[in-house]
UniProtKB/Swiss-Prot annotation:
InterPro entries cross-referenced by the UniProt entry: Chaperonin_Cpn60_CS, Cpn60/GroEL, Cpn60/GroEL/TCP-1, GroEL-like_apical_dom_sf, GROEL-like_equatorial_sf, TCP-1-like_intermed_sf
Subcellular location: Cytoplasm
Pfam families linked: Cpn60_TCP1 (PF00118)
Protein name (database record): Chaperonin GroEL 1
Annotated family: Belongs to the chaperonin (HSP60) family.
PROSITE patterns on file: CHAPERONINS_CPN60 (PS00296)
EC numbers: 5.6.1.7
Keywords from the UniProt entry: ATP-binding, Chaperone, Cytoplasm, Isomerase, Nucleotide-binding
Cited function: Together with its co-chaperonin GroES, plays an essential role in assisting protein folding. The GroEL-GroES system forms a nano-cage that allows encapsulation of the non-native substrate proteins and provides a physical environment optimized to promote and accelerate protein folding.
Reaction(s) catalysed (UniProt annotation): ATP + H2O + a folded polypeptide = ADP + phosphate + an unfolded polypeptide
Compositionally biased residues, Gly residues: 528-541
Residues that, per the record, bind ATP: T29, I30, G31, P32, D86, G87, T88, T89, T90, G413, D492
Native species: Prochlorococcus marinus (strain MIT 9301)
Disordered as annotated region, ranges: 522-541
Encoding gene, per UniProt annotation: groEL1
Amino acid sequence: MAKQLSFSNESREALEKGVNFVANAVKVTIGPKAKNVVIEKKFGSPDIVRDGSTVAKEIEIENPISNLGAKLIEQVASKTKESAGDGTTTATILTQKMVQEGLKNIASGANPMELKKGMEAGLSFVLEKLSSKSISLSGSDIQKVATVSAGGDEEIGSIISKAMDIVTSDGVITVEESQSLETELDITEGMSFDRGYSSPYFVTDQERQVCELENPKILITDQKISTLVDLVPILEEIQKSGSPFLILAEDIEGEALTTLVLNKNSGVLNVASVRAPLFGERRKAALEDIAILTGAKLISEDKSMTLDKVSINDLGKAKKITITKDKTTIVAFEDTKDLVKGRVEKLKREVNITESEYDQDKINERIAKLAGGVALIKVGAATETEMKYKKLRIEDSLNATKAAIEEGVVSGGGQTLIEISDDLLNLSKTSTDDLRTGINIVKEALLEPTKQIAKNAGFNGDVVVAEIKRLNKGFNANSGKYEDLKDSGILDPTKVIRLALQDSVSIAAMLLTTEVAMADIPEPEAAGPGGPGADPMGGMGGMGMPGMGGMGMPGMGGMGMPGMGGMGMPGMGGMGMPGMM
């Protein structure tokens, strides 16, 4: 495809337009008085959101070069979301200000590379100061952080605080939709471990990049699976039952993984696979724990068990399994509660007779996973749109609270960034020329989150920042008063602020040092066979159904795998998918 090229100031100005386009839509979502953004969806009702990452992902700009700028700032939001779970709007606001100030200075003759060095020096200084101001999160502060992160929603803050108190910070907390109007907290059996899906093709929710299986059957084995020959009988039983299916194995690779993906995509099986957690003997022990939790039989080589002998009775079950790219969460049924309790007691006895402190720690980790259970936050709402909105708010608040437990908290409302901005003066004075300018770009950007929080609450941002500096107090946008924000419980997770700063400086510096921008030139839409305005589907043949191969391996008669369906010309039956069923 032909490329459109843009050079030097022209390219940077076009990129800036894209950055501003996204940032101006995103920054209304920051603070306790934030505004909502309504997003049209191709199917279903529109979404109403107050989440920077969600807004940024939906934006496309007609100008291809400006759209590159939009995608760069969307990357800031998504990266911060992925790493910290919150802080996307803060990161976006910081990036926009750095880009704007940087481009002004470049237009005046500043060297982009020196600006970049200055910005990076400023970032290092800011992160050091941020760490020194961070304090550990006490138990009573958990609800405060959760409430602030939920935009001041005390109900959400209370529910998350209760969930954290019951399952502890290491426990599993999941958010799901409820059939009622009320948002409730439910504690059930379950656990999570650090392994994700074997292939992204198993994802069931493309927007969240998550695979969710409701009431699945579960095969657990310590064997490596590279071919599905031995699993054909059990797969046929699963297909007949219509149940979702999870394979948890030492590894699943090659032909076996390819075949599962093909059958998943063709709708033959609702299946996913996950590699077993840990390594060596600890892996086997972890699989035994999961087998107890789900009521499965561990198919182990040590017991001379083979996959071809697996029956439906050997499989485990769960209420729900949620799999991300790096984590699996199992919500179990209550009927395994006694088995889990017995397993925990057995592990406690092992701790008492184990002399190695390292082994004791590892066994205690297993006990915590098994005994902790899963806290289910069931989100209730009157409409589908409200449900999505509340669910996003709870997920953001939960992520921010976990981040606060990890690295502590600082005064919220942007107050900490303003204090550090003043400290940057000392570093700026010891630097020269464009290096100093780069530091000052970061210094000015640190004021922007507070200005936008104030603006969203109906106040003048510049006046608010000046008053914060004069009074040496923070600004409570809820009450419109200046006060000690730590005493008021307005706290920001240090991790969220740190990652927002790192991601914003990274993208802003890259954009400022860009000299050439290249984008595809959009091709004009081709006219249909009948000319402009004609039915675009005209002239197409009928669409045939995919042909279905049999189940099994080549050479097994009518159960060949992967079998090709009939391949015909358009309108003659269509092209079959390779599959095994």
